[in-house]
Amino acid sequence: NGERGRAATGLVVAKGSFAAMGGAERDLMRNLPALARRFAVSVATLHPVPELEALCSELGISLISPEKPWEPPTGALSAVLDAGMDSASRAWARCSGLHDAISDSDVVHLVSGDGSLALLEHVPESMAVHLHLLEPHRGLHEDVLHRKVDGSPKRNLGLTSALLSRARRRDIEFIRGLTDRPRSAISGNSSYTAGRIGEVYGIEAGVLMPSVVADEFPVGASSDEPASVGDMSGPYVVSVGRASWVKGTWETISMLAGSGLSLVHVGGGNDGDLARLLDYAESCDVGLWVAPHLSSLEMASLMRGARAVVSMARGEPFGLTPIEAFSVGTPALFVDE
């Protein structure tokens, strides 16, 4: 940071993709200003978004990414062959300036997600690396992502697990291989996640909690905050996260039946799942509005106007959402498994 005449420590902050712009991405972005004051920061990603580009420009931070944003391969065969890891590694290799940024830096702070772990193939063994492992790969180590939005299996779960054995082994090898490096550390985002990391990978992990900037979700609405968001005509609750069985979206609608409360769903989902949810909500006489991508100001307004922020998610720590809800004075009702 230049204090006492010393050169700032070089830090590469990396995440495979920011496309989702969910809690993990928002958490990392809200920490960049503080990191930039302490370190000489470069940001690397295979899929930037306009919000990240604007922030890096404002902070004077170098943003490294491929010319064409990377998308993880889709389809059952890609999952079985673990094609995403190889595809991401090739995309990292195509990032102009990445090699120089790593060579000129002292530390890599890597946040897990699609495409992230493949960066380790381009980081020297001797370099200090901190991995913020937000959760063990749930598609490989659990069956919750292999169920439809209503909980029914997408295909035979035993066969799915067997077909993913190669990808599962490779995931474990990557994580354990990182711990074998002489200058490495792994943190979960909660004590729950740290425990799961121990169960899945057989290693110890620290805890790096998520953070909220008070100005982003203030107790009182700022002049820039919209008075309302969406077209909800009556009382509503908010759920956050991509519509899926693991997020408990289906059960949230069931819970609201007969309550007179509508549901605002933030986080999107695939078209088929959203159509099924809309049909199910109609059958339960529950109003459902699927919100588009929202800014922090819009999220604050939406939460502020809600009766509660709710979640029926399976096997997840509470994360950022309840902290954001509490910050604006709205109750957060989350299932405790």
Question: What are the roles of these predicted feature ranges?
Answer:
Residues T45-P50, V240, L261-L277, P292:
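Glycosyltransferase donor-sugar binding loop
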Residues H99, H137, K148-I186, T193-G195:
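Membrane-proximal helix-turn-helix segments that form the acceptor-binding/catalytic region
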Residues H293, S301-A306:
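Short alpha-helical donor nucleotide-sugar binding micro-motif in glycosyltransferases
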Residues A275-L297:
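Nucleotide-activated donor-binding/catalytic signature segment of Leloir-type glycosyltransferases, i.e.
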